[in-house]
């Protein structure tokens, strides 16, 4: 067996073992799953205004697995539907707790294409709203740009129902796909999240910065808000803030962390 084939075989075995662990975790009350929270900052006040809920999984054999590795497995197997429902329940419950301290706090929850097209995610959101008593403005649903470009009939129904309910939509990873402003005007998301890859290029190159500036101007002209993702240093922040986004997030403000650490670092101190 050549080295390339051997590496592919190792990857196949690893993927298969992770898939088995994921199934076992879902079957046993989502054992080894966790939800991390990354702060979202208001650009004008530099205060915490919300968080993005992020799914995490720790393998008993391999340790913490990157979401880029385990999320696709969840989607391929359909396990993203129960796992996503579990994460939504956790995140909305924690949002309710934080709002007792910070009344305007909002929770952003990622919904995958599989969830939007194959599950009763709208009913799940509605049920959790009733259970937690959260107002509509407390929850933001995040969909990626690539998922929206591939939307099918069921996803269109999902977006229609989302609007009907009055739940805010955020378009995540903007700049990584086709970035068609026509569909932006149709969907009218409240927030456009500029991807880290776009941000990094803009900081390093003046032409890229000019392009991002034009994007931001067009987004604002469509009456949408902007969240710049991936700010990792004060230098980046000083340059990016000139684009006048409403919100920002990134390691400069705080890395994703567990709920107790998040509350200790970002909520109780406020």
Language model: regions and residue ranges:
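EAL-family c-di-GMP phosphodiesterase catalytic domain
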Residues: 10-11, 60, 112-119, 138-152, ...
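Structural preference for long, well-ordered alpha-helical segments in enzyme cores
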Residues: 69, 73-74, 87-95, 124-125, ...
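Conserved small/polar residues in nucleotide/adenosyl-binding loops
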Residues: 1-5
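Catalytic-site/binding-pocket detector for metal-dependent nucleotidyl cyclases
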Residues: 8, 78-79
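Surface-exposed amphipathic alpha-helices with a cationic face
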Residues: 95-99, 129-130, 156-164, 213-220, ...
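Active-site core of bacterial EAL-family cyclic-dinucleotide phosphodiesterase domains
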Residues: 7-10, 14-73, 110, 171, ...
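Catalytic core of bacterial c-di-GMP phosphodiesterases, primarily the EAL and HD-GYP domains
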Residues: 45-49, 79-155, 230
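Charged helix-capping and loop-helix junction motifs
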Residues: 20, 123-126, 154-158, 206-213
């Amino acid at each position: 067996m050549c080295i390339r084939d051997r590496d592919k075989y190792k990857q196949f075995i690893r993927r298969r073992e992770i898939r088995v662990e994921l199934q076992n975790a879902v079957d046993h009350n989502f054992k080894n799953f966790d939800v991390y929270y990354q702060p979202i900052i208001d650009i004008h006040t530099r205060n915490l205004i919300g968080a993005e809920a992020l799914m995490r999984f720790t393998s008993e054999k391999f340790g913490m697995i990157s979401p880029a590795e385990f999320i696709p497995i969840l989607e391929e197997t359909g396990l993203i539907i129960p796992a996503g429902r579990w994460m939504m329940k956790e995140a909305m419950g924690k949002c309710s707790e934080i709002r007792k301290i910070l009344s305007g706090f909002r929770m952003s929850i990622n919904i995958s294409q599989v969830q939007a097209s194959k599950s009763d995610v709208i009913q799940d959101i509605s049920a959790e709203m009733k259970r937690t008593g959260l107002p509509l403005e407390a929850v933001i649903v995040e969909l990626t740009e690539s998922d929206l470009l591939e939307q099918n009939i069921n996803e269109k129904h999902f977006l229609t129902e989302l609007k009907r309910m009055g739940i805010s939509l955020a378009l995540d990873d903007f700049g990584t796909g086709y970035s068609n402003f026509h569909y932006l005007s149709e969907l009218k998301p409240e927030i456009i999240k500029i991807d880290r890859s776009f941000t990094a290029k803009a900081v390093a190159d003046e032409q890229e910065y000019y392009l991002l500036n034009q994007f931001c101007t067009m987004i604002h002209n469509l009456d949408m808000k902007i969240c710049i993702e991936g700010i990792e240093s004060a230098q980046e922040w000083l340059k990016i803030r000139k684009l006048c986004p409403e919100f920002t997030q990134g390691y400069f403000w705080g890395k994703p962390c567990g709920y107790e650490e998040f509350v200790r670092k970002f909520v109780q101190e406020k």
